Amino acid sequence: MNNQRVAIFIDGSNLYHNLKRFDIKTKFEDIIKRVETIREVIDIFYYTALLDKSINEIKYGEHKRFLDKIKKIPNFHIVLCNLRKVILPDGSVDFAIKGDDVYLATDLIKGAYEDLFDIAIIISGDADF
């Protein structure tokens, strides 16, 4: 195995929605194991926001169980971002995670500056990256 230190940065919401849109099932453990065959994974950062329990208790419970499961993965860090209510043009209400890409980019730059890793892997479905 190569001694290069790898940090993985995951844009949770965008990844989730794109995997769902294309009906792709994956486990984070499998992704990490694949990278670990050639590199040392030192940290995994997952950027998301907690769903509003009062809006949809079922989705909230599913999301919470998912977060509880992935935070048991060694060196896995959940970074909580802001959830904002958005009024759509038709008057309906939706919710959007705000600031996740800013948190991710800031952590990426800070970690590179502090020499915390040699390689950064960004996992996202966001066109911003």
Range-by-range predicted roles:
Residues 1-96:
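Domain-level signal for Mg2+-assisted phosphodiester chemistry and nucleotide/NA-binding surfaces
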